[in-house]
Amino acid sequence: MNDLKLLRSKLSTETIEELYKKLNLLKKELFNLRFQQALGELKNTSRFSLVKKSIARIKTELTKRSNSEEY
C-alpha cells in the first residue's frame, strides 16, 4: 500500500468489503514488519506507526458505519 495516510473522505467513499480488504492487508504488513524487526532486518521503523494509524482509521470508519446502521 503506497498511501498509508488514508484520508477520512477517501475511507468514507469505499465499501465495507473494500475496507475489510485493506484492513487485512495492513494487518499482514504489520505482521511482516514485526517479523523483520525480530530478525533484525527492519530499516524503516517509522513504518510501524504509519501502519498502526491506518489500521486505527479503518477500524474507526467501520465502527462509525456499524453504529449508524443500528439507529
UniProtKB/Swiss-Prot annotation:
One of its GO terms (molecular function) is structural constituent of ribosome. It comes from the Bacteria. Signal peptide: none annotated. One of its GO terms (cellular component) is cytosolic large ribosomal subunit. Keywords: Ribonucleoprotein, Ribosomal protein. It holds the Pfam family Ribosomal_L29. One of its GO terms (biological process) is translation. Disulfide bonds: none annotated. InterPro entries: Ribosomal_protein_uL29, Ribosomal_uL29, Ribosomal_uL29_CS, Ribosomal_uL29_sf. Belongs to the universal ribosomal protein uL29 family. NCBIfam families: L29. This is Large ribosomal subunit protein uL29.
